[in-house]
Amino acid sequence: MVSGFVSDKNKTKAVQYKLSGHNSSALSSETVPAGQTECRENYGQMPHAMLKNTAQAEKYRAKPLTSQQTQTTMNTEANRKTEWVVGIGEALWDILPEGRKIGGAPANFAYHMSQFGLRSCAVSAVGDDEAGRELRNQLREKGVGHMLETVPFPTGTVEVTLDGAGIPSYEIRQGVAWDNIPFTPQIEELARHTRAACFGSLAQRSPVSHRTIGRFLETMPDGEGQYKVFDINLRQHFYTQQVVEESLRKCNILKINDEELAVVGSMFGLEGMQPGEQCRTLLDRYGLRIVILTCGAAGSSVFAPDTRSYIPTPRVEVADTVGAGDSFTASFLAALLSGLGIGEAHRLAVDVAAHVCSQHGAMPRLPERFTARLRNDGPAIR
């Protein structure tokens, strides 16, 4: 899914969001028995394929851990104190012209976090269907930790159509699994050990997932080193002022693009202000640590109480822009977690997002020149 980072601002107008004719009133909180959900090992049922700080995990890093290996590793006292980076919300299939690829902003975020060597996890829900089973398999193959609950709804899909410049339009199916993410004891335990989480507005279109995301954020520990990133991702009519305001009060970092900022500005009486002034107002009003504003070809800015960073958008040959914004968010946060400053984090995020725009799909493998920038400093929760 695109989250607002495109290489040509004038082309952002071409991005359209269409709905299929599914009835959203059919959403339900009913779930299948817990035993049918993946990752039911001891100690909080933490996800497998994510363990990176023990000798045993290092041995198996090149391939997914089995349930027995996960259970053994998770039972150590060191791992009971492990901190995770979590993307919570939609995990789905983007149906692209060249075939289907894993998508959903939180899943994309978790994938890119894992490329920087952090213990990341995608929290979502899938159906008891072929698409859900294959989504799990693909995440395993990509080395992405995941806690995907099985629910009696179809696995989410999005029909993606690309124009001649690689700018996508979407048909987002409703009444799907990620609309119904339950807040299980396993997800609650994961939240207690999460240092940074990224969430958006799209998965909050349904009351079930809205409640789960809210409870997850409330369960996370508080502290100066905790990050709750609201990557707003406004999609068609799948948001309300109430959801946006609640999310602004729960996060400490906001990521937004220029078109979304215009919508939010209208919501909260910020019309007539310059974009920078709008960002500063949101920063102050909601006590945020950072506001990230992306403006397509016009560049991007990062605002903090005593800092502003601006970087122009690099020129690249665009393959498609799917997932570029998610890679921006992940790279920026990974850099902060590794101890880099805002300017350095911003530079990495811009470079990674530009690279993702030059590739097909939301989850390309990042070159060593990007991932090595953080390995030299050592991410704090690797």
Locations of the language-model features?
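Glycine-rich phosphate/adenosyl-contacting loop at the front of the ribokinase-like
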Residues: 59, 66, 75-144, 158, ...
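Targeting/processing segments of secretory and organellar proteins
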Residues: 19-22, 26-28, 42-47, 52, ...
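Conserved beta-alpha-beta core of the PfkB/ribokinase-like small-molecule kinase fold
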Residues: 196, 201-281, 299
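Structural alpha-helical scaffold elements that stabilize or flank donor/cofactor-binding regions
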Residues: 189-190, 246-247, 284
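Conserved phosphate-binding/catalytic region of the ribokinase-like
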Residues: 59, 66, 70-83, 268, ...
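Conserved N-terminal subdomain of the carbohydrate kinase-like
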Residues: 119-201, 224-225, 373-382
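Extreme N-terminal basic, low-complexity initiation segments
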Residues: 2-17
